[in-house]
């Protein structure tokens, strides 16, 4: 990879319009600016639209520990928020999850992750990131893919407990609590 101007990397020559960054490019960008992410709290709802179950993923983190987390991922250059949200829901939950994206995708919260603990409730050791967080009803069947090991369904009361929040990485317990409050089911 060569650089242009003041150390700005050129896009890979084999894919000049690629929206993906290789590991070197991603590390370079992460060290210089916040990245935009979407996060989703998958939920099941009853006939009146009341949340009856909350889905959380089980994953192995970079240290090899098994932790709970939410659907999450970067927004690619040129990608709409709606498309990024759908892509990450399908990537993590499988193609038959059938997420019900809202007509107007407005996040319940904007979360700002910092690599330094204490600057906000949200921590990501790799980077400074801004995440748009959504509650998304899903109606299909689930086959966790990529690095997700399992999707666990819990009641809103279970998802509201401090012990459950402690199992979520990077402050996502706080984000889950805000999600539950946004749909009126904080236990």
Give a label for each model feature.
Residues 41, 51, 90, 115-116:
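A structural signal for the main folded, soluble domain(s) of proteins
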Residues 63-68, 127, 131-187:
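Nudix hydrolase/Nudix homology domain
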Residues 49-98:
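Conserved Nudix-box catalytic region and its N-terminal flanking loop in Nudix hydrolases
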Residues 94-141:
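Active-site segment of metal-dependent pyrophosphate-handling enzymes
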Residues 40, 85, 134-136:
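A structural signal for short, well-ordered beta-strand segments
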Residues 42-44, 58, 138:
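Residue-level signal for short segments within beta-strands and strand-turn junctions
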Residues 2-47, 123-124:
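Acidic, metal-coordinating catalytic segment for phosphate/diphosphate chemistry
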């Amino acid at each position: 990879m060569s650089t242009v101007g003041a150390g700005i990397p050129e896009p890979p020559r084999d894919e000049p319009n690629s929206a993906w960054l290789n590991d070197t490019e991603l590390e370079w960008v992460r060290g210089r600016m916040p990245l935009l992410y979407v996060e989703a709290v998958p939920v099941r709802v009853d006939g009146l639209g009341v949340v009856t179950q909350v889905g959380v993923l089980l994953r192995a983190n970079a240290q090899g520990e098994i932790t709970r987390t939410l659907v999450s991922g970067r927004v690619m250059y040129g990608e709409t928020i709606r498309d990024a949200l759908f892509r990450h829901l399908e990537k993590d939950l499988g193609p038959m999850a059938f997420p019900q994206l809202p007509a107007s995708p407005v996040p319940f919260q904007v979360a700002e992750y910092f690599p330094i603990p204490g600057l906000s409730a949200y921590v990501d050791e790799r980077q400074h990131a801004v995440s748009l967080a959504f509650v998304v009803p899903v109606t299909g069947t689930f086959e966790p893919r990529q690095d997700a090991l399992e999707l666990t369904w819990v009641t809103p009361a279970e998802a509201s407990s401090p012990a459950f929040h402690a199992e979520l990485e990077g402050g996502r317990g706080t984000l889950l609590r805000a999600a539950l409050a946004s749909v009126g089911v904080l236990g």
